[in-house]
């Protein structure tokens, strides 16, 4: 593990930063907010290729990334690539997803020292700025993640997350069972366990599936 560099408070708030966010409105408003907080926002980009080009041009000290960048590499993939170029770059994820497995079940592990923030839980840009400063001051410190600490999703296995996602995409029990080469009874048991872990009330199968779909989108930050 590399030695953390000491940053003077003034240096922290004038740090070179790149913002990786595929939503144009969020990219513009968050970038402006971080500038007002004193950061030197060198680039606001939407894709992995643009992020790596911005790193090569500006040598940022910290990167703020969305998790879901649309089709192609995720924010985690981008963060890993940034770290490969600069092992000391601070990494902050700012996303609506309460658990990254809701994007893909086989995502790589978050880079060591990364800070994971939920957009819907942040109350001010100064709170975001404080976390960005922390990521830059101690880029490799071991951190716990929110879905591990206090989310009902933490009790779900990767397989259960996958089944939850398939239900949300409209797959029937028989379709899920067929695609996985198991019995419908096995999938029914998995659905019951998912409901129990999420704290959903017992109900008829159709209503149970509706509740799982609602929980899936709520945990993505896209409530229905």
At which residue positions do the language-model features occur?
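Basic, Lys/Arg-enriched C-terminal extension of HTH/homeodomain DNA-binding domains
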Residues: 195-224
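Acidic, metal-coordinating helix/loop segments flanking the phosphotransfer/catalytic sites
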Residues: 31, 44-62
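Helix-turn-helix DNA-binding segment
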Residues: 145-192
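Non-catalytic signal-transmission and effector/linker regions of two-component phosphorelay proteins
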Residues: 1-16, 148, 221-224
């Amino acid at each position: 593990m590399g030695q953390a560099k000491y940053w003077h408070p003034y240096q922290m708030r004038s740090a070179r930063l790149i913002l990786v966010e595929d939503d144009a409105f969020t990219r513009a408003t968050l970038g402006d907010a971080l500038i007002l907080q004193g950061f030197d926002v060198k680039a606001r980009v939407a894709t992995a290729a643009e992020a790596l080009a911005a790193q090569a041009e500006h040598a940022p000290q910290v990167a703020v990334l969305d998790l879901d960048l649309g089709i192609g590499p995720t924010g985690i993939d981008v963060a890993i690539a940034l770290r490969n170029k600069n092992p000391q770059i601070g990494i902050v994820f700012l996303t609506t997803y309460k658990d990254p497995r809701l994007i893909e079940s086989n995502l790589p592990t978050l880079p060591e020292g990364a800070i994971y923030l939920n957009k819907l839980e942040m109350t001010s840009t100064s709170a975001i700025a404080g976390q960005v400063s922390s990521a830059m001051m101690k880029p490799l410190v071991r951190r716990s993640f929110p879905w591990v600490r206090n989310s009902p999703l933490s009790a779900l296995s990767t397989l259960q997350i996958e089944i939850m996602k398939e239900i949300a995409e409209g797959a029937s029990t028989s379709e899920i069972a067929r695609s996985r080469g198991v019995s419908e009874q096995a999938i029914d048991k998995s659905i019951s366990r998912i409901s129990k872990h999420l704290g959903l009330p017992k109900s008829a199968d159709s209503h149970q599936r509706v509740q799982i779909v609602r929980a899936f989108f709520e945990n993505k930050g896209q409530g229905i």
